[in-house]
Amino acid sequence: MVVLDTNALIYDALQPKRLTPLALRVIEAASENGEIACSDISLWEIAMLVAKKRLDPGAELTQFLHDVIQARALRVLPITPEIAALSQSRQFSHGDPADRIISATALYHHARLISADIKLRKLTALEVVW
């Protein structure tokens, strides 16, 4: 399975040229195999970016989110008690709570994470692709 972080999700939907060729290949392969996901907190992050006018989805927000999910048949993974607890372990030193949840989600599900975030690439227990 592959988990996309919020930026990778946005890039895939709106600006695919911002993805690296490797990230795009991994996303496409995972999508074809039905093994692509995101954390539910990414939907909230996108909503916040739209509310703050830092992202223009080009459509009504709810419809945009549904379209993003349907375009790749994304599995939206919930924050479970295990993921919440894992996100607070010492291995996650990232200051952004959403990034902690997203990386803990990938780790919990034994998934690769698609992310350009250099801090997340330093997590030795997590395979980060970019």
PLM features: residue spans?
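Glycine-rich, flexible loop/turn motifs
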Residues: 15, 51, 73, 97, ...
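Short, well-structured N-terminal submotif of metal-dependent ribonuclease cores
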Residues: 1-38, 52-67, 109, 118
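Phosphate/NTP-binding elements of NTP-utilizing enzymes
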Residues: 46
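Short, flexible helix/strand-to-coil boundary loops that buttress conserved ligand/catalytic motifs
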Residues: 13, 23, 50, 88-91, ...
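Alpha-helix capping/helix-boundary segments
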Residues: 8, 42-43, 83, 102, ...
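Acidic-histidine catalytic/liganding microenvironments
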Residues: 33, 71, 123
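Short loop/helix-cap segments at secondary-structure boundaries that form the rim of catalytic
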Residues: 120-126
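Active-site neighborhoods of divalent-metal-dependent phosphate/nucleic-acid chemistry enzymes
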Residues: 56-62, 70-116, 129
